[in-house]
A protein has these predicted regions:
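Short, structured interface segments
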Residues: 236-246
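Short intracellular "coupling" helices and adjacent cytoplasmic loop segments at the cytosolic face
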Residues: 226-237
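Alpha-helical transmembrane bundle of multi-pass membrane proteins
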Residues: 2-218, 223-225, 244-476
Length: 476
C-alpha cells in the first residue's frame, strides 16, 4: 500500500525476499546529507550578517542599538522556534516540520532581501530565526531516528560540521559580494538552498520512530526496510527496539517536577549552553569584520577575506574535534578550550587597552583572534551539544534538550544585542577582558559540575542519573 506522498508502504514477505536480492546504495547516505542542509542554512544565517551589517548600517543610517537588533532578532525568533518545534514535530512529524522550517527560511530570506527599512529587516530576521530554531531542534532528532546505530554519531556530528560549513559559505558569499556592496543579495542568498530543502523533504522518509508513536507500525517497517537496504532482520529488530523504548518514554515536564536529579541535569544542560554563548565566540562570528577593523585591517575587502579565513579554520577545527571527541573525552577538550579562549580574550583585551600602535601588535591581536576561534570550534562548539543530549534520561530527553536549546538562543540574543553597546560604554579592552574572566570561571564550573561521559553508554548514564548519583559522577 502506497501513501499519497509516496514516502511509505506496507511490505509483504514476497516484497521483502525480492528486494533483499537487489543491490542498492544505502539510502541513508542520501537522506543524511539532505537533512543536514538544515544545518548548512543554520550556519549561513549566523555568518551572513557579519558581512552585510556594515552595508546595512550605511544604507539605513542605523545606530549601534539598531545594528544590535538586526543581528540579535534572529536569536529571539530562534528561541520561539525551539519552543514551537517540539509541538510541531509531535503533531506533524519530523519530516513535515523540517519542510515547514524550509518554507519559513525561504520567506524570511526573501523578506530580508526586500526590506525597505531597518525595522522591517529586524522583523524578517526574527522570522528567519523561527526557521533556525525549529531546524536546530528537529534536524538532529530526525537524523538520529533514521540512522543505523553504527553511523548515528557520524551523521549527527556531520550535522554540527554542516553548521560550520554554512558559516564558511556565508563568509565566502559576503566576500564575493562585498565589491558590489549588495547586502540584499547577501541576505537573499539563503533562499535557493532553502528551496532545495523544501523540495527534497517531499521525497525523504518519515521518521519510523514518529510513525510508531502514532501506532503506524506497518508504515514504520516499510521505512526501515528502505533505510536498511531491505534487510528484514535488521528492520524487525530495530522496530522491536523502538517499540520497547516508546514504552519507557513519559512526560518530561512531569518527570522534571518529580525527580530532583533530572531537574539538576536539565539545569546543567542550560548552564552548558549559557557557558557556550558567553565565551564570546558569537561576538566574533557576528561582528568579525568590525573586530578585524579594530585589530588594524583597514579595507572592507581585506576584512571580508579575513573573515573567510576564520570560517575555514573553524570548519577544519570542528572536523578534527568531532573525529576525536570520543578518544580524548569531553572534559579535557573543554578544559583546554576555555583556558585558551580565556587567554586569547585576555591578550586581546590588554592589546586593545594599551593600543595597537604597530603592525606587530596588530598582528598579535589577529593571531589571538584566530587561536580563539580554533579553540572554540574544537571544544565548546561541538562538545556542549553532545553533553546536553547525553546527560538527559530517555523519558525526559525532549524536555531537557528543549530547555537547553532555548537557553542557547536567549543567551545568544543577550550577547549579540549588547556587544556594540559594551564597546561604547566599557571600551574595547574592558569588554574583551570581561569575556576572558568568564572563560576562566567556566574552567572551574567544568571541574565542579560536569561528568565525563566518554565511552559510557546512555543506558548506564541514565541508570546512575535516575538512581540519584551526583551529576559529576554519572559518567566514568
Amino acid at each position: 500500500m502506497l501513501q499519497a506522498s509516496g514516502e511509505t508502504r506496507v511490505v509483504t514477505p514476497h516484497d521483502v525476499s525480492m528486494e533483499r536480492r537487489t543491490k542498492t546504495v544505502p539510502i541513508i547516505y542520501i537522506v543524511g546529507p539532505i537533512a543536514a542542509l538544515a544545518g548548512l542554512l543554520f550556519g549561513m544565517d549566523i555568518g551572513i550578517i557579519s558581512g552585510a551589517l556594515p552595508l546595512i548600517a550605511k544604507a539605513f543610517r542605523a545606530s549601534d542599538v539598531i545594528q544590535e537588533f538586526v543581528v540579535s532578532a534572529m536569536m529571539l525568533g530562534a528561541a520561539l522556534g525551539a519552543v514551537t518545534g517540539g509541538w510541531l514535530s509531535h503533531r506533524f512529524g519530523r519530516r513535515i516540520t523540517l519542510l515547514i522550517s524550509g518554507v519559513v527560511f525561504v520567506l524570511g530570506a526573501i523578506g530580508c532581501a526586500l526590506a525597505i527599512s531597518a525595522y522591517m529587516l529586524i522583523g524578517m530576521r526574527a522570522i528567519l530565526g523561527i526557521a533556525v530554531g525549529i531546524s536546530s531542534y528537529i534536524a538532529p532528532i530526525y537524523l538520529s531516528e533514521i540512522s543505523p546505530e553504527r553511523s548515528r554519531g557520524a551523521l549527527i556530528s556531520g550535522y554540527q560540521l554542516s553548521i560550520m560549513v554554512g558559516i564558511l559559505l556565508a563568509y565566502l558569499i559576503d566576500a564575493g559580494l562585498s565589491y558590489s556592496g549588495s547586502w540584499r543579495l547577501m541576505l537573499g542568498s539563503m533562499a535557493p538552498l532553502a528551496g532545495i530543502l523544501v523540495v527534497a523533504m517531499f521525497f525523504l522518509p518519515t521518521s519510523p520512530r514518529w510513525l510508531m508513536s502514532k501506532r503506524r507500525d506497518d508504515e514504520a517497517l516499510g521505512v526501515l526496510l528502505k533505510l536498511r537496504q531491505n534487510d528484514a532482520g535488521v528492520a524487525q529488530a530495530e522496530l522491536a527496539a523502538i517499540r520497547q523504548s516508546l514504552q519507557v518514554e513519559g512526560n518530561g515536564f512531569r518527570l522534571f517536577r518529580k525527580n530532583g536529579n533530572f531537574r539538576r541535569s536539565t539545569f546543567l544542560g542550560m548552564l552548558l549552553q549559557f557557558m557556550q554563548q558567553f565565551t564570546g565566540a558569537n561576538v566574533i562570528l557576528y561582528y568579525a569584520p568590525k573586530i578585524l577593523g579594530l585589530a588594524g585591517i583597514a579595507t572592507g575587502a581585506d576584512r571580508m577575506w579575513g573573515t573567510v579565513a576564520i570560517g575555514v579554520l573553524m570548519a577544519l577545527a570542528t572536523f578534527i574535534a568531532v573525529s576525536q571527541v570520543d578518544r580524548i573525552g569531553r572534559k579535557p577538550l573543554l578544559y583546554i578550550g576555555y583556558a585558551v579562549m580565556g587567554a586569547c580574550m585576555l591578550g586581546m583585551g590588554v592589546l586593545f587597552t594599551v593600543g595597537l600602535g604597530t603592525a606587530f601588535s596588530a598582528g598579535i591581536a589577529i593571531a589571538l583572534l584566530i587561536a580563539f576561534v580554533i579553540s572554540y570550534a574544537m571544544s565548546a562548539a561541538p562538545v556542549v551539544w553532545i553533553l546536553c543530549s547525553e546527560i538527559q534520561p530517555l523519558n525526559g530527553r525532549d524536555f531537557g534538550v528543549s530547555c537547553s536549546t532555548v537557553t542557547n538562543w536567549v543567551s545568544n540574543f543577550i550577547v549579540g544585542a549588547t556587544f556594540l553597546s559594551l564597546l561604547t560604554t566599557l571600551g574595547t579592552g574592558t569588554t574583551f577582558c570581561m569575556y576572558a574572566a568568564l572563560n576562566f570561571l567556566f574552567i572551574v564550573l567544568v571541574y565542579l559540575l560536569l561528568p565525563e561521559t566518554k565511552g559510557v553508554t546512555l543506558e548506564n548514564i541514565e541508570r546512575k542519573l535516575m538512581s540519584g548519583v551526583r551529576l559529576r559522577n554519572i559518567g566514568i
